[in-house]
Amino acid sequence: MNGTISVLLAGGGTAGHVEPAMAVADALAALEPGVRITALGTERGLETRLVPERGYALELITPVPLPRKLSGDLARLPMRVRRAVRETREILDTVHADVVIGFGGYVALPAYLAARRNRVPIVVHEANASAGLANKVGARFARRVLSAVADPGLGRVEVVGTPVRSSITELDRAALRAEARAHFGFADDARVLLVFGGSQGARSLNNVVSGAAKALAAAGISVLHAYGAKNTLELPDPAPGDPPYVAVPYLSRMDLAYAAADLAICRSGAMTVAEVTAVGLPAVYVPLPIGNGEQRLNARPVVETGGGLVVDDADLSPQFVADTVVPLLTDTGRLQTMTAGAALSGHRDAARHVAHVALDVAREAAGGRKGVR
């Protein structure tokens, strides 16, 4: 370690990998002035936009996506892995990395293998309730294994939550509520339902909630609905005096959206659950019906603390909204109980915790190397 600590973040590909990495980067910069931070990615991932926007250095390697079925890609995989590991080892040497923090995904796998070869200590963070292949490999030789939940399939883990950007973790919903509702055109005393399906929206959520628009309006419920830039949303013509149904392709100010809302209907990806619970917002989670049920598992902790409900995508309907969501939104006592349960499940300090662990690991490794000499 040459005076300042150098950290390599391996979390490229999707927002679910990049956003926790950037939250930890911000925490590292706040905790350790002068820390050198480098993100590892590929030209295909969202990191090519998100990392430079946050002001951090980005190094690109050959992508190593794991094929989901037998194909020519499977035969080329060993060659791609070797090339990506070689490239990553060169980057580790160039930046004089003291520690690698991996967040899973196809960027993390070569990072773990390269770090092991270069004898750079590894910290693994798993955001999902069911760990992927990369983190299963990395956990075998990591110094510390951190997780959002207690049993992601990585053996012994330290539960720290999922790192979330500070604009969310520092949000005071009650203090910002009046400003947030004015921003979207809602009354101060409105009951507001927030609907979103991630950065791309969710068609089934769109169809169901828009189909329940009349029932929501009849109950006096305002709606803030982010339907996704690639989707369209059809709504009935409002009747005179109906509360607003604000439909937008994308919400650039999720902090204001969370502050304005009393309840959310959303998917249960790891980052969504982390943000919604960090701000203490009650939610109806609709797991994406793909994979091995990871999204249902992601929502389990907040459901167990009483901060949310889970409904299968196939069971979500306009009738469900009318029969379950409307009564919930009009029950002040139940909303207050769910708010407390959501906050109990959330981890506002996850990014700082991961950053502290990584800095400790880097210092311990540096001390060990000095001792060997």
UniProtKB/Swiss-Prot annotation:
Q: Which residues are the signal sequence here?
A: none
- Superkingdom: Bacteria
List the SUPFAM superfamilies: UDP-Glycosyltransferase/glycogen phosphorylase
> Major location, coarse class?
membrane
Keyword Ribosomal protein: yes or no?
Answer: no
E.C. number, please?
2.4.1.227
Q: Which GO terms describe its cellular component?
A: plasma membrane
- Extract the GO molecular function terms from the UniProt entry: UDP-N-acetyl-D-glucosamine:N-acetylmuramoyl-L-alanyl-D-glutamyl-meso-2,6-diaminopimelyl-D-alanyl-D-alanine-diphosphoundecaprenol 4-beta-N-acetylglucosaminlytransferase activity; undecaprenyldiphospho-muramoylpentapeptide beta-N-acetylglucosaminyltransferase activity
Q: How does it sit in the membrane?
A: Peripheral membrane protein
Indicate yes or no for the key word rRNA-binding: no
Ordered alphabetically, the record's keywords are: Cell cycle, Cell division, Cell membrane, Cell shape, Cell wall biogenesis/degradation, Glycosyltransferase, Membrane, Peptidoglycan synthesis, Transferase
Q: What class of enzyme is it?
A: transferase
Q: In which pathway does it act?
A: Cell wall biogenesis; peptidoglycan biosynthesis
Q: Which CDD domains match?
A: GT28_MurG
Recorded hits in InterPro entries, A to Z, give: GlcNAc_MurG (IPR006009), Glyco_trans_28_C (IPR007235), GlycoTrans_28_N (IPR004276)
Catalytic activity field: di-trans,octa-cis-undecaprenyl diphospho-N-acetyl-alpha-D-muramoyl-L-alanyl-D-glutamyl-meso-2,6-diaminopimeloyl-D-alanyl-D-alanine + UDP-N-acetyl-alpha-D-glucosamine = di-trans,octa-cis-undecaprenyl diphospho-[N-acetyl-alpha-D-glucosaminyl-(1->4)]-N-acetyl-alpha-D-muramoyl-L-alanyl-D-glutamyl-meso-2,6-diaminopimeloyl-D-alanyl-D-alanine + UDP + H(+)
- Give the protein family: Belongs to the glycosyltransferase 28 family. MurG subfamily.
Q: Which NCBIfam families match?
A: murG
Entry function: Cell wall formation. Catalyzes the transfer of a GlcNAc subunit on undecaprenyl-pyrophosphoryl-MurNAc-pentapeptide (lipid intermediate I) to form undecaprenyl-pyrophosphoryl-MurNAc-(pentapeptide)GlcNAc (lipid intermediate II).
**Designated name of the protein:** UDP-N-acetylglucosamine--N-acetylmuramyl-(pentapeptide) pyrophosphoryl-undecaprenol N-acetylglucosamine transferase
Q: Give the organism the record lists.
A: Mycobacterium sp. (strain KMS)
